[in-house]
Amino acid sequence: MGGLASDPADAGDARAGRQKLTTCQGCHGLDGLSKNPEAPNLAGQVESYLVKSLTEYRSGERKNESMNIVAKDLSDEDIADVAAYYASIQVDVLPP
């Protein structure tokens, strides 16, 4: 029974994911900290959430013109790897 990257066998490869960020980094940044107010930060995001979101963008279940175009050519492995990379980034949150 496979899960959304919650099963270790389904988990992506963060190193491979970093190599696949050519398109992603344009909006979300290589470090996952977006400088684009229209694109969310992905650094430190929950891996299973990223897998679910990218899978839904790819299928068209989730709508965003840019993301639907970008995600349509991603394989399951690409999605798992990119999600693993962004989830692996440590984000320090400072108190206000």
What is each of the regions a protein language model found here?
Residues 41-44, 73:
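Short, conserved sequence motifs enriched in acidic/basic residues, glycine, and aromatics
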Residues 40, 48, 65:
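Glycine-centered loop/turn positions within well-structured domains
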Residues 1-4, 48, 72-96:
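C-terminal capping alpha-helices of c-type cytochrome domains
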Residues 55-76:
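Short Fe-S-cluster ligation motifs
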Residues 19-30, 40-41, 52-55, 78-84:
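C-type cytochrome heme c attachment motif
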Residues 9-33, 43-45, 94-96:
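Sequence/structural segment immediately N-terminal to covalent heme-attachment motifs in c-type
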Residues 37:
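Short beta-to-alpha loop/turn elements within the nucleotide-binding domains of ABC transporters
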